[in-house]
Amino acid sequence: MELKETFQKVKAASKTLGLLTDEQRNEILQAVADAIIAESPALLKANAEDLAKMDKANPLYDRLQLTEQRLQDIASDMRHVSTLPSPLGKVLKDKTLENGLHLQRVAVPFGVIGMIYEARPNVTYDVFSLCFKSGNACVLKGGKDANASNSAGVELIHRVLITFGIDPNVVTLLPATHEATGEMLNAVGYIDLCIPRGGKKLINFVRDTAKVPVIETGAGVVHCYFDKDGDLEMGKRIITNAKCRRVSVCNALDCLLIHESRLSDLPVLCEGLAEKQTKIHADAKAYEVLKGHYPDTLLYKAEESEAKMKEADANVKSIWNTEWLSMQMGIKTVVSEDEALDHIATYGSGHSESIVSNDETAQKKFQAMVDAACVYVNAPTSFTDGAQFGLGAEIGISTQKLGARGPMALEEITTYKWLITGQGQTRA
């Protein structure tokens, strides 16, 4: 496969975006949002083709599925992005040197952003809206599981762009093949930034293979630590929401860490989990407390579960670093906050972590010591989301430290350049 010509067209098209005013970009985004609602039957039909090929028990099924409500949410997010202030031209630094030179550091687009993602057709729309608003062209490489959904979405966007006289190559969908991924990752000079959004396997492959700049997003092994001074009812609400609101997303809870002095409260903390039929893989202490108080068919010994997982997959190192993406989670007993912090440092992915505690000292220590993009006190990790943060749609959750970190929205997909104005000065 040879995609060089495709990348050349995208690069050329990206230059035309600089000619658009923010008002024009906003009008086009609103038109695409309107088209999503108007053409929702066709979009759902394409999505049904993808869903028919996937087992409903697959953790990716929920991510893949589009509904009328989800399409309305996608359109609403796109309209919201159109109302946000443009990041372009924003003066980040302004100074005049002693020699009279005037310096400004201003925000500009990256140029062409490559996005690699799995069975999540909503990402197609989110990436387009954020890239278009920020003056970036985008190259999309979706998973084969969502190929019909992604194709229908990009075709819709193209139709709207053409009616406004915009080169449709500003958003390009690549074939859903492994070869296309490799070509994108090696498209030096054409792709200015690549963002993978998916599981560990995808993230690791991109990081190890790419020759173009990469920002890692996605994989989350998420913890909630219930401290010795945690409020029981608050903890129950937070744990249930963090785990059960939507299990297939990267901010969903994977492991509850509970202070051993609060083990007697574990059955109450897990009531909401039982109602939602959540499978629990508990360590020995937690298992003994839950036995008889939690449905037998949903309660497992973590040690035995880990052995079965390792038998099925030689790459499994520990049950505690599992991103479940399903109605399953672990529970681990700790003797102190320090042990909880050590556990998170060992098994966490730097995504989102939370503590439930009324002890201000414990709260501040947790915030200071946890190395993650988003650190919560008395709130569920389900809030890690660009829209929830008031950023509009997100292009991903960055788990790295260089460049963007946390929810990536408009500002995070711009770079900057220096503008220097003089009056004929020369350097000695």
Give the role of each language-model region.
Residues 119, 126-134, 163, 202-322, ...:
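ALDH superfamily catalytic-core signature
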Residues 311-428:
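Conserved C-terminal structural/oligomerization subdomain of aldehyde/semialdehyde dehydrogenase
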Residues 22-24, 165-171, 247-252, 279-285, ...:
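Flexible, glycine/charged-enriched surface loops at secondary-structure junctions
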Residues 83, 92-233:
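Rossmann-like NAD(P) dinucleotide-binding subdomain of oxidoreductase/dehydrogenase enzymes
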Residues 1-102:
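N-terminal Rossmann-like NAD(P)+-binding subdomain of aldehyde/semialdehyde dehydrogenases
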Residues 3, 22, 232, 263, ...:
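Residues at or immediately preceding the N-termini of alpha-helices
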